Amino acid sequence: MPIEEQTRNSGNRRFVRSSRALAGEFLCLIALVALMGSVGTPYAEAQTDRKPPSRAAKPELPKEKQTTLGLYVTAKEAYEKWKAAPKKATVLDVRTPEEVLFVGHAAMAWNVPLFLQTYVWDAERGKFPMKPNPDFISQVKKIAKPGDTLLVMCRSGGRSAMAVNQLAEAGFKRVFNITDGMEGDLVDDPDSVYRGQRMKNGWKNSGLPWTYAPTPDRMMLPKIR
């Protein structure tokens, strides 16, 4: 056989062997990818099956300000949320009518008191106690539906948390607690001249719009019994 033909045949055999080797490597790669995919699937499924953490608990908040729905905003965040879509969000002030009139209120807010002020002095507790408003839920339902967004405030976030929980039990799903309320938290710095006063945060201290002017068309006043 001529030398040139021997060389050509030898080259062809090397090409065939090389092609077979590449094909074998490609098949091994496919098998490896498939194996990795099958091993990863249970992990992915486990990740998918994991339940998201509960939003109800917010460790940095005092327990009395936490709610079952776990939806929280500051006064400033609540105002921005309302301002962005005033027809889709309702600001709900659950303080007493007396607080609304004498302390001031956000003009866009509806006043539906969670508690009503009494005028019988409790000597043991050292205050005029409040009593629950029996019409609270029915009054809220006159201005909002269970699917509406409600931004709930009181003086400093405690009563509003209670209101959120009651509304949640009544079927409302998007109810946010305004955690610093209208007046804010007490200053606890022993060196501050404002110690013991509500000068820390809250709607008024955040520079948000408020007024003393009554808005009786937005107040659910208690029935005289």
Question: What are the language-model segments listed below?
Answer:
Residues 1-21:
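N-terminal secretory signal peptides that target proteins for export/translocation
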Residues 2, 35, 42-87, 101-149, ...:
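Rhodanese-like catalytic fold shared by cysteine-dependent sulfurtransferases
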Residues 24-38:
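Bacterial N-terminal signal peptides
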Residues 90-95:
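Short hydrophobic beta-strand that contains or immediately precedes a catalytic carboxylate
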Residues 153:
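Short, surface-exposed ligand- or partner-binding patches at beta-edge/loop junctions that are enriched
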Residues 157:
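Conserved G/P- and acidic residue-centered "switch" motifs that form tight phosphate/ATP-binding loops
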